[in-house]
Swiss-Prot record:
InterPro entries: Kinase-pyrophosphorylase, PPDK_reg. This is Putative pyruvate, phosphate dikinase regulatory protein. It comes from Streptococcus agalactiae serotype III (strain NEM316). It catalyses: N(tele)-phospho-L-histidyl/L-threonyl-[pyruvate, phosphate dikinase] + ADP = N(tele)-phospho-L-histidyl/O-phospho-L-threonyl-[pyruvate, phosphate dikinase] + AMP + H(+); N(tele)-phospho-L-histidyl/O-phospho-L-threonyl-[pyruvate, phosphate dikinase] + phosphate + H(+) = N(tele)-phospho-L-histidyl/L-threonyl-[pyruvate, phosphate dikinase] + diphosphate. Its EC number is 2.7.11.32, 2.7.4.27. ADP binds at G151, I152, S153, R154, T155, S156, K157, T158.
Amino acid sequence: MEDQLTIFIISDSLGETAKAIAKACLSQFPGHDDWHFQCFSYINSQERLEQVFEEASQKTVFMMFSLVDVALASYAQKRCESEHYAYVDLLTNVIQGISRISGIDPLGEPGILRRLDNDYFKRVESIEFAVKYDDGRDPRGILQADLVIIGISRTSKTPLSMFLADKNIKVINIPLVPEVPVPKELRMIDSRRIIGLTNSVDHLNQVRKVRLKSLGLSSTANYASLERILEETRYAEEVMKNLGCPIINVSDKAIEETATIILEILKTNGQVAKNL
């Protein structure tokens, strides 16, 4: 229709936030479907704003702008008022109110929320990576990982991988088993990207018995025997020594405590610093 009602979304970033607010508000008017969205992204100068108003001149327009630049937002308000456009400034009053109460000046940088969204998606990617390569499912992931955690069974490899993935670090964990050759990829990367985990024999004996019980198996199985645990522990320590990687004993440590130690080691070694 010629007099179609149009919402102009004017933003110094993508305009997704403003559009989401507009849609939420329009849901209160279910009987009216003549609204049309027109999004103007990355409006960062008065010249570009002028072009938006030129386009609005022949339409019935409601202006919604999300501009962190105070001068630009003020200009948009004045133009709307002088040309009798209905409008709402989504950011100025909120930012000024927060600044007044907190005593902190705003950054005035457009696109910050978008950068935060990018961090979120990177974190999701890291978590998906940890799940995909959990428990050595595909050793080729070693070459793509920021961090490789190695250790025998029940040394908290998986929960640590997930915890660190939430810190935006791509982690793969590799189980060390005497009968299984060490992945060749471990010798193809910087040993500072590898962390070895150990545990006390007594603690491993206890947690493995609990694990067997949860699976409905006998606690006397070889998996939980002291002889087997000693064999695995000696083998793992020899592998870690040959690789020259840092080793952490996780006995009596919470996941968060071990993760903090790992993060400090990575920072000291200059590894994955971009994520920390």
